[in-house]
Amino acid sequence: MSKRLRKMISHEQFQDWLAHMDDALEAFLARLPAEMRERLDGSPESLGVLEAWLLERYPTIDAILEDEEASHLDGAARYVGEVFRRMLGGHWRLRLNNPKYVYYGIPEFWFLEKKDTPIASLPLVTSSLDRRTGKHLLLVFNGAKECIERNRAQQP
């Protein structure tokens, strides 16, 4: 009964997390209903499918932060992150150099070499449960896409 986001404490732990990305995503998808699994195709639109499932399953952020839900939270965060990364061309990273950093110990992804653009999928999943719009993940994706395209166009 944790009620807190689980943070990573080492780069080795992060590298292990990355190395198991495909297996963890496969295990997460296998736990979902078949009709939903078929709709999670890695597209930006599938973020809405995932968000609808999250909203139906979890009435509050605290509900997904329970220890027994850790694999669902991790799986959902991985799925969201991989959709962003694959569609927008980003890279995963972990920052452990500043404990006051907002995403300290939380895997994040970034997209631009010359302008830092961090997004962390785990807080995106929990914020979608707080906002409860059913459109939050896709809205953030589209905003990130616009920002990235604009910045890439300005880079030499």
Map each language-model feature to its residues:
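Short glycine-rich, low-complexity/disordered patches
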Residues: 40, 64, 91-94, 156
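N-terminal low-complexity, intrinsically disordered segments
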Residues: 1-71
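Amphipathic protein-protein interaction modules
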Residues: 67-125
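Generic structural signal for hydrophobic core residues of well-folded globular domains
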Residues: 54-57, 83, 87-88, 128-132
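A recognition module on extended beta-rich or small alphabeta surfaces enriched in W/G with H and D/E
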Residues: 101-156
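Amphipathic alpha-helical interaction segments
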Residues: 22-26, 36, 61, 87, ...
